Amino acid sequence: MKETPSDMIQEISSSKLKMNLISKNSNPNNNNNPPSRDPSLINNMSFAHKPSGQRGKNSHNLEINYTSNTNDNNIPSTSTALLQKVVDKADILEIEIINSLSMSSNLKIEINALGMIQGSKRQAKDGLTFFGLIDENNIFDTNDKKDVDYIINTNEVITEENSNILGRHFCIRFDINTMKYYIKDLGCGYGTFKKIAKKAQIKDSYLLNIGNSYIVCTFGVDEYYPEGMVIPEGNKTLNIKVFSEIAQTEPHFFNPKQFKRIYIGRDISCDIIIDDSLLSRIHCTIEYDDEEGWIIYDGKIDDDESKNKLSTNGTWLYLIEEIPIEDGLIFKNNKNAFECRLINRNKK
């Protein structure tokens, strides 16, 4: 298994998430990245392993290794007998692969209350559908030998160094009480991110992905806060740390009394400027709401709504928490993008 390199630049720990963010010199002669057909949906975003890109001798290659207490041991399953009683009443969840470098686009996966309707590897009918990678030939000594329902194909050659991507990556669960489907990342492999359609409330230790860059959001005062600096609204202070392929930035601190609106993007007018070719000039906007707290929007938000504009490549939120699946939800895992549709059986 690949060890953490000595050039680790930062470790961020919380009760929910622990990540090692590593900046390494890239090999300019080694370009293993296949051409992306649509960078808005496919970033070369591999948490466990990321090939070096052809950028130059002074460039950096961002690699994120993370562990989380998120796993599949505490995901409740439901008996087949109970699920059989509601399967004809529940919506069908249709998941379409809308962009992929390793799987057929437009391929649709259908899930009902029992699980995958066709092609499940587990055939458990317990209301759970696990997506991930498995070591079918038992070559590697991995901790996770559990089966998955759907294998996420990858163009990567699995070696001892990157074998930690083997396992269950995310789970879709049907809840018999709410009659809804839920999705959650399981802390293995590449990370599962949902595309922010309108807005999202920022919570402590949230991880965001924009372009080839990652943003970690925390609240309050930490060891990076400038010594002697006045701390207005201390608990409401938003700390933002940006990690990108080029370099990591110094922490940014924002409090609601001084900042009505925060812009992040490539433009020099932004409060946080990131040198990332996949970002829009103003890629996302963060505002403070007295009731909801800090809120992030994709694209530019302006007092004049006619000037509002979505980003080209989207703003993505890591699914560290289980969320309900709504019709039209777009999420990604590895270099694959998926769109969810809910089909109402009872609709006439």
Segments the model singles out, each with a brief description of its role:
Residues 117-205, 210-211, 255-335:
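Forkhead-associated
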Residues 1-115, 213-281, 287-292, 334-348:
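Regulatory inter-domain linker segments that are low-complexity and enriched
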